[in-house]
């Protein structure tokens, strides 16, 4: 984004002149190397670009760069544990106690919980060796996006290997080796938000007749900034994390450059360099804005005298410390990049001495270097922040004006971002968008838009002020991609066989399926595929066919047509399976309890449009004195509160000094929980693995953002096993929410993350009891259909 040439060519939509970006960050006469270009493509089409490069330049002149994968906390303990003969279960338990993919270590408490003695000679040796090999090279892998292109043949200069993926080759040198040789490397990166934006803009064009691009989206829309100031940013690029949501109301962006700062300020560099609070105080008028010299005012005026970007650190070094552009570029190289700690400390003496020689006071020079030293913990270039800010604004504008198209596009671009489909669906419904379930007659592979009610009339009370901002007049129909285990090929066949050629012209018209048998005959699906569709309750349009009735109808078809098992007696003269079977007698099946419906929704769709699991548990929660999450809005700051919810997100940023941020939700609202390091170490198993938690802590409110600072956590995951016991006494129109896996999918008898459902076990042992209760022995609707075949 620093290059006017790249802007004119359309490589970037960010105008470097408008942003005043530093061209030397892109290329300079002192840098005897080609410019560093990172190009982001739609993540779904990145492979097309890679194959295009191979096709244009040939594999002998183009290849993906390599990268060295090093041992980190989990891989180190796994490798050492394996060498010492620990069992897989023990290794898994030890490694799972380490947060994420960082260079953490196993605590003594974690060792004790696995049943081992942390003081034993063997265990001490394992922990010591695992710590020592942290950061050691482990193996060579493909670089995330670095592409090498040369004029002469690559295989005459460096070794080339075949990648595991078909049609890929990579050079067996990493990017530092390539830089040393002066070989051109361009980063060809995939970005999920670009796929999302393209799909959303296509939906807006198709259903609203408005054609926009990144360059033509209306700029500086006040409604967009007002939405972001309320931290209403779920799904919005770069500002949807818990840390960014906390920062948005405090920074209160009102212009595009404010978004550039928002992207850059929540990074380890500014945080470690103590730049965040001074900037916010100056922005609010709580601290005077001052500059030690006119030269530095020109460098720092856009950020109120506080250095927030790498380019500013380079300019300060040149202007205040007398660095040459070449030395400033070496300073840039010493700054950290993602997952690589910088070595900026080696410039301390030169920079401070240079500033003293230019008349600056030592106190200011040391404070200035301390701030710049923060970039040794990963700071953001202004050019990157500007590029990302453009996507922040575009995605926020779509969310504000067309939440239906934005939600559908987010679902169709998965996996990406912080949030799973259930949270995206919940947020869309809160913004007034009607969301409809996947259906055999209405759904395609992707989620689509259908005529629906005006979203402005259905807004949740939290978003009522957006009434005049939202243009949405469509409902989102969930795509067949949401059904677990259904392939894209099968879903395309469903749509294809639904279409018939029109007799009047060459166009095609949709002929709805009218029965399970019709679906079977037209598609030729096996029983297994029909069961997947029935499990997902995708036959609702077939005469209000319920999940249980659909499974019965699928089982009633028997295995005729399941080609591998057809017997000669049931084949036609041509050898093809006969498609005519006797009609199954009609039966009246008892309705499935809504609790069981919700369980199956989560099992086969990973979300539910019927109800939130917390609704079923409310009597038990009330008995424990646990309040609904929306009560936090009425709780004064500083008061203690007791809440609960499904854990939807856990974050432990490297810049947060061990603090864990959890997001939990119940049937009423989402709550933000802060877990301090001492509490985390004491309750580590709950924080890391609980699906449903109760939280006791102190309410904190700042700039409209509410947190609960936890001092006690209780694992209530076993409560989820009670869902199947609840009948139709719950409002079936409740909002949808997410629980990652309320039931372990591979072990159907184990409910909610490993807690054994004794009711299910009892029903397996006594099928007659299951019949009396009106539920199946597997906690699903399969049992009645199996009995039909036996009878």
Predicted features along the sequence, with ranges:
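Noncatalytic, beta-rich nucleic-acid-contacting surfaces in large DNA/RNA-processing enzymes
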Residues: 1-791
């Amino acid at each position: 984004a620093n290059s006017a040439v790249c802007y004119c060519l359309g490589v970037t939509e960010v105008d470097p002149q408008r942003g005043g970006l530093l061209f030397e960050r892109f290329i300079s006469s002192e840098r005897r190397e080609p410019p560093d270009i990172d190009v982001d493509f739609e993540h779904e089409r990145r492979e097309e670009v890679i194959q295009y490069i191979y096709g244009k330049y040939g594999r002998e002149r183009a290849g993906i760069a390599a990268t060295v994968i090093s041992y980190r906390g989990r891989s180190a303990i796994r490798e050492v544990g394996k060498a010492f003969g620990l069992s897989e279960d023990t290794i898994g338990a030890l490694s799972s106690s380490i947060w994420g993919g960082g260079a953490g270590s196993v605590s003594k408490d974690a060792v004790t919980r696995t049943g081992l003695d942390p003081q034993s000679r063997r265990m001490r040796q394992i922990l010591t060796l695992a710590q020592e090999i942290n950061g050691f090279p482990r193996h060579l892998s493909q670089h995330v996006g670095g592409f090498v292109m040369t004029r002469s043949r690559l295989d005459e200069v460096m070794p080339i290997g075949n990648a595991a993926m078909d049609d890929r080759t990579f050079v067996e040198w990493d990017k530092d080796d390539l830089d040393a040789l002066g070989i051109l490397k361009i980063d060809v990166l995939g970005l999920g938000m670009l796929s999302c934006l393209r799909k959303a803009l296509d939906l807006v064009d198709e259903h609203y007749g408005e054609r926009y691009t990144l360059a033509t989206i209306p700029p500086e829309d006040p409604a967009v900034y007002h939405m972001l100031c309320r931290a209403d940013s779920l799904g919005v690029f770069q500002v949807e994390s818990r840390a960014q949501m906390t920062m948005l109301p405090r920074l209160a962006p009102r212009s595009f450059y404010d978004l550039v700062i928002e992207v850059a300020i929540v990074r380890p560099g500014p945080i470690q360099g103590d730049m965040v609070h001074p900037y916010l105080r100056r922005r609010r008028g709580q601290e005077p804005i001052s500059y030690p010299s006119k030269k530095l005012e020109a460098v720092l005026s856009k950020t109120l005298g506080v250095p927030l970007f790498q380019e500013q650190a380079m300019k300060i070094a040149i202007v205040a410390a007398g660095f040459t552009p070449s030395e400033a570029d070496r300073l840039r190289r010493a700054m950290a990049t993602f997952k690589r700690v910088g070595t900026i400390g080696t410039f301390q003496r030169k920079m401070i001495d240079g500033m003293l020689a230019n008349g600056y006071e030592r106190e200011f020079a040391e404070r200035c270097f301390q701030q710049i030293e923060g970039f040794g913990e990963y700071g953001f270039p202004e050019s990157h922040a500007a590029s990302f800010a453009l996507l922040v604004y575009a995605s926020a504008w779509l969310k504000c004006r067309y939440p239906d198209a934005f939600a559908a596009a987010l679902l169709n671009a998965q996996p990406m971002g912080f949030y799973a489909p259930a949270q995206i669906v919940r947020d869309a419904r809160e913004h007034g968008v009607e969301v409809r379930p996947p259906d055999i007659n209405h759904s395609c592979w992707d989620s689509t838009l259908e005529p629906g009610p005006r979203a402005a009339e259905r807004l949740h009370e939290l978003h009522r002020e957006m009434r005049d901002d939202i243009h949405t007049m469509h409902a989102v129909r969930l795509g067949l991609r949401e059904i677990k285990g259904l392939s894209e090929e099968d879903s395309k066949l469903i749509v294809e066989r639904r279409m018939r050629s029109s007799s009047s012209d060459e166009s095609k018209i949709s002929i709805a399926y009218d029965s399970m048998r019709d679906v079977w005959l037209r598609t030729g699906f096996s029983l297994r595929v029909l069961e997947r569709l029935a499990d997902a309750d995708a036959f609702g349009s077939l005469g209000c066919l319920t999940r249980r009735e659909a499974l019965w109808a699928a089982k009633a078809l028997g295995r005729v047509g399941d080609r591998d098992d057809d017997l000669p007696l049931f084949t036609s003269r041509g050898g093809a399976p006969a498609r005519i079977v006797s009609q199954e007698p009609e039966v009246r099946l008892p309705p499935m309890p809504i609790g069981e419906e919700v369980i199956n929704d989560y099992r086969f769709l990973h979300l539910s449009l019927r109800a939130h699991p917390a609704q079923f548990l409310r009597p038990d929660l009330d008995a424990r004195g646990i309040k609904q999450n929306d009560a936090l809005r009425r709780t004064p700051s500083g008061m203690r509160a007791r809440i609960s919810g499904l854990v939807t997100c856990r974050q432990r940023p490297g810049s947060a000094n061990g603090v864990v941020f959890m997001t939990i939700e119940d049937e009423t609202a989402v709550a933000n929980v802060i877990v301090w390091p001492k509490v985390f170490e004491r309750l580590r198993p709950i924080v890391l693995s609980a699906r449903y938690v109760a939280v006791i802590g102190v309410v904190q409110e700042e700039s409209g953002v509410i947190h609960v600072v936890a001092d006690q956590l209780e694992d209530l995951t076993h409560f989820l096993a009670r869902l199947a016991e609840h009948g139709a006494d719950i409002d079936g129109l409740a909002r949808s929410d997410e629980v990652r896996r309320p039931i372990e999918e591979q072990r159907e008898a184990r409910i909610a993350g490993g807690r054994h459902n004794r009711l299910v076990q009892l029903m397996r042992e006594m099928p007659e009891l299951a019949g009396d209760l009106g539920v199946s022995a597997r906690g699903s609707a399969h049992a009645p259909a199996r009995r039909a075949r036996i009878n």
